[in-house]
């Protein structure tokens, strides 16, 4: 029997605010334990939460970007459960009336086919604290710095049908929240993580199978591995006549397996009710319009524009718009390079990306500015230097800094374009290799490349390749 996986993701994006969702405590990552938790975060008697307006703006911004309905009236609720790192005994979230509903994104599959993924809702909530196990023996430490950190939980429909689709969708949301500037997307720090709901059913059947939830997966690779393991596990259970249990499971990357955590709860288990300390959130049209004005050019629109405006391939445009920082860098290079779009794309995706990857750096950390790279590309385009020499200039620029023109002048790298000078170089090479000249004129055409190489070697790579080819052909004819 052929089985079909049915997958939905609940992505938790930590919103990039300086203070928490209901208190003024800081949200900076890496502070010593329990130094960024105030009385509100600790749930001490007599304190009242106050909603951070920046959080609301970010949620609305996301909703507009996915063409969703923005609720003008939404409500915060208490989600009641006991856990050591939840000091109040409840989590403030949104349940029946979320701030964002009925949106969608379009993902592109490997075969180029586009697929629409529904986003059922996106709601605001506070994060819990963190349990620490590594530095303790026989006990668990609690760090409440993260308690009260604002989260946007983004819930997809059960629209994903493979591990690849799930990862593609997750990357799409990751790119989007970073473009919008509402989340830094740092998965190592837990700023962007997901829970995955997965069931399998016979191919062609509409009824959903029993689902399991995989908790707190914080890398694209782990999402793919966890889902693949769970598909295989559920398939084995059903084909052996067993029954899949509705439960919450944890993915163990070291063992590459999922293991049970607890029986999956239903919403009723959390006893949701409106938080009496928080008024309903009411948004005016003017507020939503104000947020709409701050929307940047979104990834899909930017990618299409790059194809049309810069005549790039769909692949190149996709790579260059993978992050807002990279797209901005590329456009600044093109501007400096007087519109040399394709050549700029080749250098940004090739030599620059290679150098950055080698050192584990991002485009934001590039020691070569877009203006420096753009000037170098101008010198290739106007044939001041050859592409080969440009690599030498780039290496110097990357390691030591400096402008392309200064490096070219200092190292004497300007391309030889004077016809007489190139002819002199050719004559020297031909005179030094009479046997090869005779063989070439006798029909051994492959020796042409040998002569080109010898002239380039003699000129230290500075002879203009096009002129060299033309003059050499005349000399050998």
Curated annotation (Swiss-Prot):
<dbReference type="InterPro" id="IPR018027">
    <property type="entry name" value="Asn/Gln_amidotransferase"/>
</dbReference>
<dbReference type="InterPro" id="IPR004413">
    <property type="entry name" value="GatB"/>
</dbReference>
<dbReference type="InterPro" id="IPR042114">
    <property type="entry name" value="GatB_C_1"/>
</dbReference>
<dbReference type="GO" id="GO:0006412">
    <property type="term" value="P:translation"/>
</dbReference>
<dbReference type="InterPro" id="IPR003789">
    <property type="entry name" value="Asn/Gln_tRNA_amidoTrase-B-like"/>
</dbReference>
<keyword id="KW-0648">Protein biosynthesis</keyword>
<protein>
    <recommendedName>
        <fullName>Aspartyl/glutamyl-tRNA(Asn/Gln) amidotransferase subunit B</fullName>
        <ecNumber>6.3.5.-</ecNumber>
    </recommendedName>
</protein>
<dbReference type="InterPro" id="IPR014746">
    <property type="entry name" value="Gln_synth/guanido_kin_cat_dom"/>
</dbReference>
<keyword id="KW-0436">Ligase</keyword>
<dbReference type="InterPro" id="IPR023168">
    <property type="entry name" value="GatB_Yqey_C_2"/>
</dbReference>
<comment type="subunit">
    <text>Heterotrimer of A, B and C subunits.</text>
</comment>
<dbReference type="InterPro" id="IPR017959">
    <property type="entry name" value="Asn/Gln-tRNA_amidoTrfase_suB/E"/>
</dbReference>
<keyword id="KW-0547">Nucleotide-binding</keyword>
<dbReference type="GO" id="GO:0070681">
    <property type="term" value="P:glutaminyl-tRNAGln biosynthesis via transamidation"/>
</dbReference>
<dbReference type="Pfam" id="PF02934">
    <property type="entry name" value="GatB_N"/>
</dbReference>
<dbReference type="GO" id="GO:0050567">
    <property type="term" value="F:glutaminyl-tRNA synthase (glutamine-hydrolyzing) activity"/>
</dbReference>
<dbReference type="GO" id="GO:0005524">
    <property type="term" value="F:ATP binding"/>
</dbReference>
<keyword id="KW-0067">ATP-binding</keyword>
<comment type="function">
    <text>Allows the formation of correctly charged Asn-tRNA(Asn) or Gln-tRNA(Gln) through the transamidation of misacylated Asp-tRNA(Asn) or Glu-tRNA(Gln) in organisms which lack either or both of asparaginyl-tRNA or glutaminyl-tRNA synthetases. The reaction takes place in the presence of glutamine and ATP through an activated phospho-Asp-tRNA(Asn) or phospho-Glu-tRNA(Gln).</text>
</comment>
<dbReference type="InterPro" id="IPR017958">
    <property type="entry name" value="Gln-tRNA_amidoTrfase_suB_CS"/>
</dbReference>
<dbReference type="Pfam" id="PF02637">
    <property type="entry name" value="GatB_Yqey"/>
</dbReference>
<comment type="similarity">
    <text>Belongs to the GatB/GatE family. GatB subfamily.</text>
</comment>
<dbReference type="InterPro" id="IPR006075">
    <property type="entry name" value="Asn/Gln-tRNA_Trfase_suB/E_cat"/>
</dbReference>
<dbReference type="GO" id="GO:0050566">
    <property type="term" value="F:asparaginyl-tRNA synthase (glutamine-hydrolyzing) activity"/>
</dbReference>
């Amino acid at each position: 029997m052929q089985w079909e996986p049915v997958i939905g993701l609940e992505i938790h994006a930590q919103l990039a605010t300086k203070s928490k969702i209901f208190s003024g405590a800081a949200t900076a990552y890496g502070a010593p334990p329990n130094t960024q938790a105030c009385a509100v975060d600790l749930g001490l008697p007599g304190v009242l939460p106050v909603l951070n307006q920046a959080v609301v703006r970010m949620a609305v911004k996301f909703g507009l970007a996915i063409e969703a309905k923005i609720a003008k009236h939404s409500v915060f609720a208490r989600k009641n459960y006991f856990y050591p790192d939840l000091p109040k005994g409840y989590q403030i979230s949104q349940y029946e009336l979320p701030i964002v509903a009925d949106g969608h994104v379009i993902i592109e599959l490997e075969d180029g086919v586009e697929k629409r993924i529904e986003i059922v809702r996106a709601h605001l909530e506070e994060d819990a604290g963190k349990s620490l196990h590594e530095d303790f023996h026989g006990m668990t430490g609690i760090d409440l710095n993260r308690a009260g950190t604002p989260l946007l939980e983004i819930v997809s429909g059960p629209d994903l049908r493979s591990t690849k689709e799930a990862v593609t969708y997750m990357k799409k949301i990751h790119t989007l929240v970073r473009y919008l500037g509402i989340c830094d997307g740092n998965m190592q720090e837990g700023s962007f993580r997901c829970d995955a709901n997965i069931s399998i059913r016979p191919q062609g059947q509409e009824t959903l199978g029993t689902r399991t939830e995989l908790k707190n997966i914080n890398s694209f690779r782990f999402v793919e591995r966890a889902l693949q393991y769970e598909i295989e596990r559920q398939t084995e259970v059903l084909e052996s006549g067993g029954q899949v249990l509705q439960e919450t499971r944890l993915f163990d990357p070291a063992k590459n397996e999922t293991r049970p955590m607890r029986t999956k709860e239903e919403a009723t288990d959390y006893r949701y009710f409106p938080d009496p300390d928080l008024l309903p959130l009411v948004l005016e049209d003017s507020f939503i319009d104000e947020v709409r004005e701050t929307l940047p050019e979104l990834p899909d629109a930017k990618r299409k524009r790059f194809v049309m405006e810069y005549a790039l391939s769909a692949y190149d445009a996709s790579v260059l718009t993978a992050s807002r920082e990279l797209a901005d860098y590329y456009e600044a290079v093109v501007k400096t390079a007087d519109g040399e779009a394709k050549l700029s794309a080749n250098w940004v995706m090739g030599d620059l990306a290679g150098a950055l990857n080698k050192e584990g750096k991002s485009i934001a950390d590039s020691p070569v500015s877009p203006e420096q790279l753009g000037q170098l590309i101008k010198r290739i385009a106007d044939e001041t230097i050859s592409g080969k020499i440009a690599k030498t200039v780039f290496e110097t620029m990357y390691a030591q800094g400096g402008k392309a023109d200064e490096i070219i002048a200092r190292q004497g790298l300007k391309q030889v374009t004077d016809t007489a000078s190139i002819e002199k170089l050719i004559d020297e090479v031909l005179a030094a290799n009479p046997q090869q000249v005779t063989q070439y004129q006798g029909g051994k055409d492959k020796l042409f490349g040998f002569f080109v190489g010898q002239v380039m070697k003699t000129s230290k790579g500075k002879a203009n390749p096009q002129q060299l080819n033309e003059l050499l052909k005349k000399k050998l004819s």
